[in-house]
């Protein structure tokens, strides 16, 4: 919620609203899952209403916040691992011949992202390095997956915008731009 208070008497309200949450996968605490002693996946859960199929076979990473011990206090640090780190792989067609007949995804089984081999050190050391803190100082986290694909213009005349989470973020951006560029008035 953001607003500007006029300097004089308030005459009324001008409002704009947009949801700013973006459906994604939230990383659970202690998320590392070693599968069949071969590879490591992250335990995640769905956040918001989403089209799960759009998350498959794309470069993903992790961003959010960590809570760290610093000088006797608990402080929050924003963090983004700025590299292609994870993928939610589709099963090859020869392993699931009915994949093109429509899939029903189970988030707790089918959409767990692949992090690395069984010798992977897990996600916490990677997040700690990105945050510039010692792994032992991290007390908790609030981390989410995000798609690393960049937005682009497409179409014959570049008349279309293609970008992950566009429907959520453009609404929030439009409201913020409106607030920042509004002329001072007698309304909140």
Regions found by a protein language model. Give the residues of each.
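N-terminal hydrophobic/helix-forming segments and targeting peptides
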Residues: 1-188
């Amino acid at each position: 919620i953001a607003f500007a208070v006029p300097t004089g008497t308030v005459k009324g309200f001008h409002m704009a609203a947009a949801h700013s949450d973006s459906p994604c996968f939230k990383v659970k605490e202690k998320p590392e899952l070693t599968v069949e002693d071969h590879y490591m996946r992250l335990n995640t859960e769905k956040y918001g209403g989403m089209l799960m199929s759009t998350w498959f076979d794309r470069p993903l990473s992790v961003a959010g916040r960590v809570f760290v011990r610093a000088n006797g206090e608990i402080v929050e640090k924003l963090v983004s691992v700025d590299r292609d780190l994870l993928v939610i792989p589709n099963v090859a067609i020869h392993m699931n011949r009915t994949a093109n007949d429509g899939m029903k995804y189970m988030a707790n089984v089918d959409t767990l992202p692949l992090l690395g081999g069984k010798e992977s050190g897990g996600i916490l050391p990677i997040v700690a390095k990105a945050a510039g803190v010692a792994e032992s100082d991290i007390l908790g986290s609030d981390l989410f997956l995000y798609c690393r694909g960049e937005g682009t213009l497409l179409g014959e005349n570049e008349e279309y915008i293609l970008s992950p989470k566009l429907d959520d973020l453009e609404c929030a951006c439009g409201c913020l731009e409106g607030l920042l560029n509004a002329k001072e008035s007698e309304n909140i």
